[in-house]
Structure formats: C-alpha cells, structure tokens
C-alpha cells in the first residue's frame, strides 16, 4: 500500500507531509527547505521552473513567472476580483473560451488548475525522492470558504498532477487536526488562518478524537499578497513624488518592488525598522534612478491596518453562527505566515480577549493536518472523527423567484437532502432546476451555480407530478444535484463545476444584505406566497365549480363566483394581507361546496367530507410549505407546496 501525502497548496508557499511511524513528518524539498514557493516560470530556452528556482529568476523574467495562481482558481474572467488581480501581477490574465480566468506565459494560455498541477507535481516529486517510491494518492487542502468551482478546480489540479485526490480538506480543519490530535479534554478552539492569499476563521469543538466544526467564515481574496501590495504602493508613491516616474508601469521594476516589500514585511516582524535599497530600479533622460528609503514597523502597521481589520467581520459572523461569544473560546490557533506579524497577533488577542496560541508552525501545520487525514482514510490513524461544514446555504428557484433552501449553511458534511416539488402548469412536460448558493430570500439575489432540465414528465394537471430534488454535498464539499420524476422514474443530475466561483466579497454581501434586508425579503416572500395560495385556490375552485355545477344550489354558485372574482381583483396588488383575507373567504365557501357535493352523492364522491372539501378547492396552504389545507393528491400522497415545482412539507409525512 503506497503512502498518502498531505499537501498544503498555498497561495505563496506549498508544503508536503506524510505519516511515518504513526507521526506526521514534513518533507524537505530538493533545496533543503520545508516549504516551496508556489511559483512557476518559463524561460526563453523553453525550460519550466517550479518553486525556488522560479522565484530566483522572477526579477529578470516577470511576465513569464506565475505566482498567486490560487487566487484565480475556479474564477471567471468577468469576476471583479480577476480585474483587481490583473493590476497586481506582471503576467497576463486572459479570458478562456469558457469564460474562465486563465493565464498566459511564454505565448501559451493555461488554466489555473494546470499551473497549480505543476506545483503539486513538485510536491509529489519531493515526497517520492524522500520515500524512494512512487506516490499516487493525496489529501489536498483548500481555504474553508472555497466554493464548489474552486474545490473542483483544485481536485482537477491534483488529477492533472497524477494524483488521486482522496479528500479535499479545509485548511483550518487540517490545522485543528494537527493541533488537537493528542488533546483528550474537550476544548472549543478558533482557528485564525491568514495566509498568502486567503483568510479563514473556523470555530471547532475538539476532544477525544472528535473534531466538530461549528461554523466557518472567511475572505478568499485577503492575505499576504494584499499586504505586499500595500507596501508596493507606498514605495511606488514615494518614488514617484521624488522622481515623477511610476514604477508600477515597469513589470521588471514591479517585480523588484514585490521582492523588496515581502522582505521588508518579514524583517519588520522582528525589528522596528528596515532599509529598502534598490539601485538602478529605472532610468530616464538624466540617468539611472535608485530607490533608497527606510520603513518602520509603525508605518507598515498604518499601511495595512484596514486589511487587518477586515479579518474581524468574518470572526464575528463565525462566532454568531456558532452561537458563541469570544469568551467561549478556550484557545485561538494562529495559522498562515501572516499571523507572524505582531499587529495581527495583537488584533486577534484583543478581539478574543486572550493571547493566541503560538505552539504550532503556521507554515507547516496545515500540511501536517492533511497527512493526518490521509492516515485516517488509510486506517493508520485510529479513533479520529472529523465533522466539517458547508459555508453557504444551497437551494433552488421556485415559483415567483423564491430561493428555497435545501441545505442551510454550516450544515455538517457529507450531507444529503431531498424535497418533493411539483409542476406549476397543466400538462407541463419539463422543468428547469436552477441551483444557487447564498442566504437571501429571492433567487436572483443569490449566486447561481448552474441549472439543468428534467424532461419527459407525464402530462398531468399542475400539482400532480411529484419531482424529487436531491442535493448531495460530499466530504470534499462538492455539490451534486439530481431530480427524479417519481411517476415516470425519469432522472437527471448535474455535477456543479467551474460555473464561475463565488467571491468572498459576494459572499459577504449576501450575508450582510440578508441581515439588512431581512424585513424586506420577508414581505416580498409573504406577497409571493399569498399570490401562490390564491392562484392555486382559484384554479381548483373554478375546476370544481365546473365539474360539480349540477350538484350545487344557485346561491352558493353565485357566492363562489363572486368570491373568485374578488380574489382575482386583489391578486395583482402589493397587499399580502388583503390577498390572504380574500383567499380565506373563498376557502370557507369551498368547504361549503365540498359539503354539498358530498351530501348530494356521497358514493360517487367516494371520499369523506374532509376529502370532498379538498376536492372542491381547499388548496389554501399550497404554496406556503404545506400548512393546514395543503393540496393532497390522492390517498396517501404527500403534502406538496406549489412552487415552480410544488414543495412537500416533510413535517407532515
């Protein structure tokens, strides 16, 4: 049985680890270093360089040296953050035929997955050189807030690199595994993971081999690269003041600034001042120009204060979602190279009211956790149970543009949820299932992941077909959706992939807007549900009136006809209370109609008085989730809610 490697595929650096003798071990690369720069370069000679070799030549070959590729993985070219990234890097970001963001180097267009695969191949080779045998299986880590497209793209990168990816594991969860493997007593911990390109915060309860994630949040476009850019902008602005030359327009000068910024940032974690000297950075008609200035820790902290403060909003949300306060956290674990910055440590300590735990190596702990997870999957590590969560709610569009959630955010994965819907029109032979992620009440306010059609539905009156929609999120956090017509057995499924990733800004916007627009959303939904109820009742009442006209007295027929017209008149209005009131009035008359039909010919009706009343039009709860009087289709049928496909109320099964 071959070894399973644990790989931390980072934005700035990557790391590989294995289980050896029951203990995780980080493997040094061919340069003798335990972390490898996540960089790929293509030389004029057609040679491909990965890791430290690529980093060494970046200044002289900036347009063909690719770094921070992880920020593009699973993203669309039209994504606003792709445009932001274009202003930060010297290499070309181009639009692929499918609309994804790709990169171009040495005249060749490549997907971010392909570039990431080159880094994974380097990590694979590092492990093989140490073990003296081939490696084919891996556990790869991703930010907890990565969406489905980004996770799928990461898994694709593993496959391109020749690895069978046994599991995609969230970085904070991997760090918690490494920290808590030997912890027997129960603890509640917060994993604060600020890396090179992404930020995650996860709240976990750990103890006696059980690692349960209570909530997770984050920002997939916040990390060390942004801190570097803040320094680069400062250096470029200072130089421009003195020399009237913008160094950001020179790709080679920009690469030198990046190296200097990264070096200064690291030095200022242990000293109060550093000197930045870049001779011959550029030239003009008067001759060569040199950049020479001092940067203090205080100045650096003022430059990046806004970035550090941005980490706190996800922390507050994660605590709120977990139903906890900062006082409930026993330990705060710092993960990612940026947590070495004193300013970050101070802000985290102040927020949680306790000194952060610094007993783990922030650059290696994620890879170690990935190796432990590999050991768990292979049976080398016993008595460990890992319970992770999905970061966003998942659902589908139903009648009126409502977003019907099937799986709520922070639900433990793997998970599977099914719900039965129905058609919205008579003889409807196909339905379109549209899938989204988000927290808003209306589908259009959330992020569409994809859609598919279920065709071949047998012709039937609306509300009769039973269409079971199933959401399945696997242990990798990847989404599968299927729909099945329970009558015909027809089934259609979609594996959501590379449909344009959700950005951290979009996620934050969804959550914040969901909170600020909660009242507005509730009113909008109430109006749609009231109209759906009314429409369903009008339809069934008119049908019953037509079919059983000879069994009803004229007075009741006139009353029902008038009530139907009254209800139709108020339905277009933006007044859910008025619609509900008229719906209730028609429902009461429908009950009387059912009673008359039953009294007139109980055997022909073939049902009890309550069922007769239903047949006569008692469909008042049809679109609300199956309240009292929800439509029943035959004996033993499930209560369904009329939506774009009617929703079954599971509680009444």
UniProtKB/Swiss-Prot annotation:
Q: Where is this region: Disordered?
A: 608-653
Q: Name one Pfam family in it.
A: HSP70
Residue ranges annotated as compositionally biased, kind Low complexity, are 608-617
Which intervals of the chain form a coiled coil? Answer: none
Q: Which GO terms describe its molecular function?
A: ATP binding; ATP-dependent protein folding chaperone; unfolded protein binding
The domain of life for this entry's organism is Bacteria
Q: In which residue ranges is the amino acid composition biased (Gly residues)?
A: 618-629
Phosphothreonine: residues carrying this PTM: 198
Keywords from the named record: ATP-binding, Chaperone, Nucleotide-binding, Phosphoprotein, Stress response
Induction (record text)? By stress conditions e.g. heat shock.
UniProt xrefs under InterPro entries: ATPase_NBD, Chaperone_DnaK, Heat_shock_70_CS, HSP70_C_sf, HSP70_peptide-bd_sf, Hsp_70_fam
SUPFAM superfamilies in the record, alphabetically?
A: Actin-like ATPase domain (SSF53067), Heat shock protein 70kD (HSP70), C-terminal subdomain (SSF100934), Heat shock protein 70kD (HSP70), peptide-binding domain (SSF100920)
* Residue stretches of biased makeup (Acidic residues): 639-653
Q: What does this protein do?
A: Acts as a chaperone.
Q: In which family does this protein belong, per the annotation? A: Belongs to the heat shock protein 70 family.
HAMAP family this protein is in? DnaK
Any idea what this protein is called? Chaperone protein DnaK
Q: What is the lineage of its organism?
A: Bacteria, Pseudomonadati, Pseudomonadota, Alphaproteobacteria, Magnetococcales
Please state the gene responsible for encoding this protein: dnaK
């Amino acid at each position: 049985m071959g070894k399973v490697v644990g790989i931390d595929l980072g934005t700035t650096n990557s790391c590989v680890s294995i289980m050896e003798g029951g203990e995780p071990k980080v493997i040094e690369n061919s340069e003798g270093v335990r972390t490898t720069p996540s960089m790929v370069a293509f030389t004029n000679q057609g040679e491909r360089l990965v890791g430290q070799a690529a980093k060494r030549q970046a200044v002289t070959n900036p347009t063909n040296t690719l770094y921070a590729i992880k920020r593009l993985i699973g993203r669309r070219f039209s994504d606003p953050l792709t445009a932001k990234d274009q202003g930060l890097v010297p290499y070309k970001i181009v639009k692929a035929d499918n609309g994804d963001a790709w990169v171009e180097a040495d005249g060749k267009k490549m997907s971010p997955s392909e570039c990431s695969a080159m880094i994974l191949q380097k990590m694979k080779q590092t492990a093989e050189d140490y073990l003296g045998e081939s490696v084919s299986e891996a556990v790869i880590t991703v930010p907890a807030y990565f969406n489905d497209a980004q996770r799928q793209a990461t898994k694709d990168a593993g496959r391109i690199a020749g690895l069978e990816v046994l599991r995609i594991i969230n970085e904070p969860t991997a760090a918690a595994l490494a920290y808590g493997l030997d912890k027997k007593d129960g603890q509640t911990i917060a994993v604060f993971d600020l890396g090179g390109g992404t930020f995650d915060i996860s709240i976990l309860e750990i103890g006696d081999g059980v690692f349960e994630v209570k909530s997770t949040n984050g920002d997939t476009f916040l990390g060390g690269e942004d801190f570097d850019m803040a320094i680069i902008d400062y250096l470029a602005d200072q130089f421009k003041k003195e020399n009237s030359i913008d160094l950001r327009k020179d790709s080679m000068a920009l690469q030198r600034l990046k190296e200097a910024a990264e070096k200064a940032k690291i030095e200022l974690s242990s000293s109060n001042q550093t000197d930045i000297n870049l001779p011959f950075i550029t030239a003009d008609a008067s001759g060569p120009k040199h950049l020479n200035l001092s940067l203090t820790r205080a100045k650096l902290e003022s430059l990046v204060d806004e970035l550090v403060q941005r980490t706190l909003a996800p922390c507050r949300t994660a605590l709120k979602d977990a139903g906890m306060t900062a006082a409930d956290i026993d330990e705060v674990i710092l993960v990612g190279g940026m947590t070495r910055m004193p300013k970050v440590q101070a802000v985290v300590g102040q927020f949680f009211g306790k000194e952060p735990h610094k007993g783990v190596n922030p650059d290696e702990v994620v890879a170690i956790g990935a190796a432990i997870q590999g050991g768990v999957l292979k049976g080398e590590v016993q008595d460990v149970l890992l319970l992770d969560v999905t970061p966003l709610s998942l659902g589908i569009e139903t009648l009126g543009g409502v977003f019907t959630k099937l799986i709520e955010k922070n639900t433990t994965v793997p998970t599977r949820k099914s719900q039965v819907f129905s058609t919205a029109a008579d003889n409807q032979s196909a339905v379109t299932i549209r899938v989204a992620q988000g927290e808003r009440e209306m589908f259009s306010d959330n992020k569409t992941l994809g859609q598919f059609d279920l065709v071949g539905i047998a012709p039937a009156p609306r509300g009769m077909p039973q269409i079971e929609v199933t959401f399945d999120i696997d242990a990798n956090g990847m989404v599968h959706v299927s729909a099945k017509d329970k009558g015909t057995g027809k089934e259609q499924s979609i594996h959501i992939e590379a449909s344009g990733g959700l950005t951290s800004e979009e996620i934050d916007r969804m959550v914040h807007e969901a909170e600020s627009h909660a009242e507005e959303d509730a009113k909008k939904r109430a109006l749609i549900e009231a109209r759906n109820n009314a429409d369903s009742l009008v339809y069934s009442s008119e049908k019953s009136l037509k079919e059983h006209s000879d069994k009803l007295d004229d007075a009741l027929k006139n009353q029902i006809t008038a009530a139907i017209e009254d209800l139709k008149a108020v339905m277009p209005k933006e007044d859910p209370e008025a619609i509900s009131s008229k719906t209730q009035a028609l429902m009461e008359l429908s009950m009387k109609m059912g009673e008359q039909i039953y009294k007139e010919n109980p055997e022909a009706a073939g049902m009890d008085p309550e069922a007769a009343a239903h047949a006569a039009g008692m469909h008042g709860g049809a679109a609300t989730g199956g309240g009292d009087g929800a439509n029943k289709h035959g004996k033993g049928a499930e209560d369904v809610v009329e939506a774009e496909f009617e929703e079954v109320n599971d509680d009444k099964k």
